[in-house]
């Protein structure tokens, strides 16, 4: 189902506020706020790739995805001899454990036999003319006179029997884009969620700094800025609260960014419990950020037809 949309040329559909643009022929999704653009696309074999997030832009940013034969980066079975197509090198919207992407995953599940992994592919989308809410969880909302919208993209692995709704909320005038994920068991057996990040954000270039805020009791929010180097950097809390020791908020900043100018991406987790944020720079200098509920010792049982709702993340550029 699609709500509040009208067809335009080149099979493009746009909502009445121009916040959500969908080109069905290219399978291209573009989210616009007053000053920013976020874009993703369904690519070969049904994978949902991340193309762009930053200052407002026009057009198709698919050119950012380049395919090379990287040694020891495997490819999906469907690709056969086309070794240049590897999930290990493609910027993705919601990465999975166990499908050939060896970077830090956003999502990991275990079946009743103890086998980890899944392979999420695109199924459908839905556009709603209001900002989504999350039952029992805090979320950004619109005030009187403000317009909010939602894009829901459904991914599925029918073999494992899991479905994931990726929720994108847009509050256009405030330049806010929010993210959440709803994991649903569509199988006849129990499934165990080992990790379900609220957001996964890939950057095709890696020349960034990480800004975060450490501390202790009575001395919270101490500023720290460091280069994002190769490997994985993790911050978070296992204390049952977001804690004095680390704030569930980070900034990915360009090397030359300061208080007056430069590229900065603020990511805030709207949750007061244990959390995890991980930033990885990979073998090809791409950067990935995942943020969500702390996955250390985490195992959430999903009975058939039940679901897990990941708390919301708010993003600004």
Q: Which residues are covered by each model-predicted region?
A:
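Short, Lys/Arg-enriched N-terminal segments with co-localized hydrophobic residues
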Residues: 2-17
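Polysaccharide-binding surfaces and accessory modules of carbohydrate-active proteins
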Residues: 22-30, 34, 38, 48-280, ...
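Contiguous, structured surface segment used for ligand recognition
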Residues: 41
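Short, charged beta-turn/beta-strand-edge "cap" motif at the junction between a beta-strand
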Residues: 314-317
